[in-house]
Amino acid sequence: MAADDHFSLFGLPARFALDPVQLEQAWRAVAARVHPDRYATASAAERRVAMQWAARANEAYRQLRDPMLRARYLCEQAGVDLQTESNTAMDPAFLMQQMEWREMLDDARRDPAAFAALRAELEQARLRMQQTLSELIDERGDYQQAGTKVREWMFVEKLAQELSAAQPMQ
């Protein structure tokens, strides 16, 4: 079994827009072929290779089923260094939005209505990110700009995690 990337491992096109049902079916087919139990009576080397393929299939599935990780993977495969730790440069409008969301997060800690409003706003931001990334990657092939959007999406996800941890005080 040879596959150069996660998409070819599952026989899927390298696209951001991906049918989750097709992805799961492809993963199940690959996982069934390389499941270590199928190699219980094989040599130690064959069992080790099966285990490595199973781990690879599981990791590929984990990355491809998460839209943000899939976008990140596609950008990296296209040679874009996302510099997630060092590159904090973002669009000024998005920076202003970040500040607004941070203020809303402070309110959300005290107010259930503010909590619900911010959660809904972040969900809308996720949907917009997915639409934008589908256009940038699948339609325009603009991986550099897609990388910028992935960094923005990472901020949205981090804020969503903080929101989940910040249940409003009743």
From Swiss-Prot:
PROSITE patterns: DNAJ_2. SMART domains: DnaJ. One of its GO terms (molecular function) is protein-folding chaperone binding. GO terms for cellular component: iron-sulfur cluster transfer complex. The keyword Chaperone applies. Keywords: Chaperone. Residues 5-79 form the J domain. The keyword Chaperone applies. GO terms for biological process: [2Fe-2S] cluster assembly; protein complex oligomerization; protein folding. Co-chaperone involved in the maturation of iron-sulfur cluster-containing proteins. Seems to help targeting proteins to be folded toward HscA. Belongs to the HscB family. Interacts with HscA and stimulates its ATPase activity. This is Co-chaperone protein HscB homolog. It comes from Bordetella parapertussis (strain 12822 / ATCC BAA-587 / NCTC 13253).
